[in-house]
Amino acid sequence: MTQKGSMKPVKKKKTEEPELEPLCCCEYIDRNGEKNHVATCLCDCQDLDEGCDRWITCKSLQPETCERIMDTISDRLRIPWLRGAKKVNISIIPPLVLLPVFLHVASWHFLLGVVVLTSLPVLALWYYYLTHRRKEQTLFFLSLGLFSLGYMYYVFLQEVVPKGRVGPVQLAVLTCGLFLILLALHRAKKNPGYLSNPASGDRSLSSSQLECLSRKGQEKTKGFPGADMSGSLNNRTTKDDPKGSSKMPAGSPTKAKEDWCAKCQLVRPARAWHCRICGICVRRMDHHCVWINSCVGESNHQAFILALLIFLLTSVYGITLTLDTICRDRSVFTALFYCPGVYANYSSALSFTCVWYSVIITAGMAYIFLIQLINISYNVTEREVQQALRQKTGRRLLCGLIVDTGLLG
């Protein structure tokens, strides 16, 4: 009896953890896993205090401290929402604010337009190499692309259409082209062909869950040079895929080592590769495209090419309509470089500035489209081209525009 009585306290122990309380609209779980409130966004930031102290005392600030400050700001920048405050990705904000400002400033004078329109690609390339070097995902370029489409269409409706040179049919064609671009981008943003691990029992993940897991993986590896952002994406997939991974190849040990992905714990099939930015393997991976913030692989390559083609056609058509309105009786090519009186009024100056901005963006997209067509004709992917250049096994043709890898025919 005494033994049974002594075991009673053991039975009373609770093994189940208490359920988490629901979050109010201003509460959230921060990157440390603790409950926080948006009202305390300016409180208890040791890294920011240290940075201000070092700035006041004219001392140098370590890059790691700057990264921690930016991570803290990014984590605390939230808006109240149902069931908890939602995080706002700060990389989407600069295009929304700076693009209209730059374009309006560029329309004040011809020289200002030259300076601004020259500096915009330079700043975009600088930001690209900065994020590419750190192997981070960013919504900056996706935000820039979508907002550019919307803002160019807005300027067209406000400044070009009222002049009476654009008919209803032409406006309808341009509008349909814009919607087709958005549909193609939506298709290209879907699963590019992620590989699944047969040994994993995880269920399929949605695109939003995959993006969330990728962000968690990035937060875990920030500040550690050379760390890959696989994070919690290992052994996970966005789609149940029977072609996900192959068995161990029967070739040489070197070949088996090359095909094995230590991050995803699977054997990659031919032409698949692990994306260090997305943190997962992709079938027939071509490249990671910052304009869609996703990889381009087997499943979305056609949609990516289609989006580029529709964008080029729509952009050229919109540029032609605008120049025909503000620079009458001149060819499109002549009006680009010689349009007398275009800066006489602000409306035509803004339209002309937006035309040149569209020309710059269109030229960049045309280059990407041309490279894609060349790679398709040579039956190679962009990753295979870059790998051949690094290993010095490829031959440059046509001033480097074409690269013959010598691997696939």
UniProtKB/Swiss-Prot annotation:
Its main location: Golgi. Residues 107-109, 158-165, 324-331, 375-409 are lumenal. GO terms for biological process: protein localization to plasma membrane; protein palmitoylation; protein targeting to membrane. Residues 259-309 form the DHHC domain. It is a multi-pass membrane protein. It comes from the Eukaryota. GO terms for cellular component: endoplasmic reticulum; Golgi apparatus; Golgi membrane. The chain crosses the membrane at residues 88-106, 110-132, 137-157, 166-186, 303-323, 332-352, 354-374. It is found in: Golgi apparatus membrane; Golgi apparatus, trans-Golgi network membrane. Keywords: Acyltransferase, Golgi apparatus, Lipoprotein, Membrane, Palmitate, Transferase, Transmembrane, Transmembrane helix. GO terms for molecular function: protein-cysteine S-palmitoyltransferase activity. The active site is at 289 (s-palmitoyl cysteine intermediate). Residues 1-87, 133-136, 187-302, 353 are cytoplasmic. InterPro entries: Palmitoyltrfase_DHHC, PFA4/ZDH16/20/ERF2-like. Signal peptide: none annotated. The DHHC domain is required for palmitoyltransferase activity. Belongs to the DHHC palmitoyltransferase family. Interacts with NOS1. Palmitoyltransferase that could catalyze the addition of palmitate onto various protein substrates and be involved in a variety of cellular processes. Palmitoyltransferase that mediates palmitoylation of KCNMA1, regulating localization of KCNMA1 to the plasma membrane. May be involved in NOS1 regulation and targeting to the synaptic membrane. This is Palmitoyltransferase ZDHHC23. It comes from Homo sapiens. The lineage of its organism: Eukaryota, Metazoa, Chordata, Craniata, Vertebrata.
